[in-house]
UniProtKB/Swiss-Prot annotation:
Keywords linked to the UniProt accession: DNA replication, DNA-binding, Mitochondrion, Mitochondrion nucleoid, Transit peptide
Transit peptide: 1-30
A biological process from GO: positive regulation of mitochondrial DNA replication
Pfam families hit by this protein: SSB (PF00436)
Annotated GO MF terms: enzyme activator activity; single-stranded DNA binding
Protein name, UniProt field: Single-stranded DNA-binding protein, mitochondrial
Highest taxon above the source species: Eukaryota
Subunit (UniProt): Interacts with nmad-1.
Phenotypic consequence of gene deletion: Reduced mitochondrial replication, transcriptional hypoxia response, sterility, arrest of germline cell proliferation, reduced frequency of apoptosis in the germline. Severe mitochondrial DNA depletion in somatic cells but does not result in major anomalies in worms development. Hypersensitive to ethidium bromide.
Keyword DNA-binding: yes
Species this protein is from: Caenorhabditis elegans
Keyword Nucleotide-binding: no
CDD domains linked: SSB_OBF
Amino acid sequence: MLRSLSTISKSTVRCMSLTSKMAAEQPSKQEVDDLFAEKPQHHNPEQRRHAYSVNKVELVGGVALDPLYKTGRNGKPYLIFNIITNSYFKQQDGTTLDQTERHAVSVFGKQAEILSKTIKKGSRLMVQGRLHYSGGQKDEQGNRTQRNTYIIAQTVQPLARAARENPDQH
């Protein structure tokens, strides 16, 4: 037992020694410049292997206004609507703060066509999708255009229908 502990100790020391040597290495000036430089003209995107990443959004909320159903230039349908979410925060003085946020959602294809007939203002939905940004580019004067954030929906699940305007109707 004692012998195995000393063996583990030697291997641990060897590993720590190698790690400290690697940590002490300094990158060259050229490596630092390459790291922060804009992409070179000869950059081949196929050479780069991307690390694992996730762009996923899940929202549960209510539809703010009746959705807008349109057909794109490519002839395919899309649906645009806003979903409202609420968050509640307790402040230091004990009062509760209600934060309401509006999220722009876009749905494409057959799902847009189906949802245009089933959801309306007040419908409760669960939306799963990804974030998408547009705008933010510089114009000729060097001013940046407004950057907009959208959610491109992959799944939209109705949770509850909007309340009827006249509850006496069946």
